[in-house]
């Protein structure tokens, strides 16, 4: 059952190592024990539903699977990302100039999703309440 390494048995630089294998097995075990894949599917569906419920005209499309979510906007995402970071302490990614990328940890809860939705709504509402003005000031 146990793997017994001996001198000369491993001979590649990039072939892996015992510590790396043990770390990977531990991660897989935690993912199973904490049901992280199930959480990603369930909370991911909830996340997308909450995003769609925002109903903002600035949101062109919401796409994703599990917790890998993209929100395509009709404006550049940089002002929203800056406000999320500096006002709400939430870091987001981006793709191109108009897609906000959301990649939270697999253990995220519905409560944390609700916190993000409230923060995003605040940022979007701040932009929508200034029609006709340059958005560079955000």
Question: Where are the predicted features?
Answer:
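Conserved N-terminal phosphate-binding loop of PLP-dependent enzymes in the Aspartate aminotransferase
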Residues: 1-138
